[in-house]
Amino acid sequence: MAAPCHRGVSAGDDAVGTGTSFKRKVRGKFPALPGTRPSVHNGQLLVSTGVPSLDHILGGGLAVGTLLLIEEDTYGTYSHLLLKYFLAEGVVSGHEVFVASANDDPTETLQDLPSPLTDEVPRQNDPKRTKDTSGPADDSQEMMKIAWRYQNLPKVETLPISSSRFGHYYDLSKTMPPEMSAKSHRFYLPRIMSANQKQNVSEVTCNYNQLLESIQRVVHQEGYDGSNPQKRPKTILRLGIESLGSVLWADDICSQERPENQHSLTRFLYGLRGLLRTSLSVCVITVPTYLIQNKAITTRLRSLSDTVVGLESFIGSEMEANPLYKDYHGLLHVHQIPRLNSLISDGSDTKDLAFKLKRKIFAIERLHLPPDLSDTVSRSSKQDLAGSAKLLSSGCGPAAGGEKHLDF
């Protein structure tokens, strides 16, 4: 039986007297983590790869908790450069960095990170600048007779780039100061093997297990999995693994068509993805897939990754001397885009992409053919043109059938 309705009592008085359980539904707020932003497609928290053009191709950036697999180019030059961009972005954004390698010492890799570019920020409320510019004001007015509109604008000074913005640009001609990347986690396989001599299982399985245990230790001790509260402000853990699966990791997938330990790398990726999904971390791995003899293994590696990008370098190939590709250094192939919190992936166009390495920056652009500005573009020789003009003039009647040719 419904409760009787009392007349004479307004709805506002009843709400004040008894209170109400109604609460306005608001959108959930994302954690204010430095160097991150929510995706406009699926609401996933994103971090930058260090290359803004690559972020745009991947749908805005790398989602936290995912794995990016970079298929190395022939000599590994550009793939290792992308890994350095990823690590440099983490250092500038204030993220924790974990570097693992079996070839180059991670300390040397961190010392070779590109330096971030500076922003030109106008400083309007600077007392020193106002004092210095108050004296020669008359001189500046005399000099600004033509460009008088610019004399009241604040001067522009180069300041260090802000760590709170998403995505930065880097100068490849300069390296980052060592103190910026001094605090990081490193895994150097030769040093680990020399300290751990006894191995009860196969060498490659032991190497991958030690790497996974090292990552688990950092994730758990630093509190990225939520088990232990982070002592400092909450941030993101960036994992960078170089040339995983190569012979330097004692793996034989790159040297034999039927390797004995073909499941060691796939088991490692299974464990790594499970660890990434339950922690505030993101990983980038480079794999020399061009050396893998069995292509079925390459297919498995792609299926075990969230995002797969391949680099095809022009070095040593026929396309290096092709004038159509003279402005580029290689092609970028996007093999896989993640499907996170949605049925389909981002619909951005990922075809016909090329990259070029300039003196200071690494850029990814849409592949387009340069305009052909030569004198003989799509034309025959002058003799052929004269012959065709003669045929045309002969069919135009007696008035046009003289000795002169049609001039186009």
From Swiss-Prot:
InterPro entries: Elongator_complex_protein_4 (IPR008728), P-loop_NTPase (IPR027417). It comes from the Eukaryota. One of its GO terms (cellular component) is cytoplasm. Keywords: Cytoplasm, Nucleus, tRNA processing. Residues 120-132 have a biased composition (Basic and acidic residues). It is found in: Cytoplasm; Nucleus. Component of the elongator complex which is required for multiple tRNA modifications, including mcm5U (5-methoxycarbonylmethyl uridine), mcm5s2U (5-methoxycarbonylmethyl-2-thiouridine), and ncm5U (5-carbamoylmethyl uridine). The elongator complex catalyzes the formation of carboxymethyluridine in the wobble base at position 34 in tRNAs. Component of the elongator complex. This is Elongator complex protein 4. It comes from Xenopus laevis.
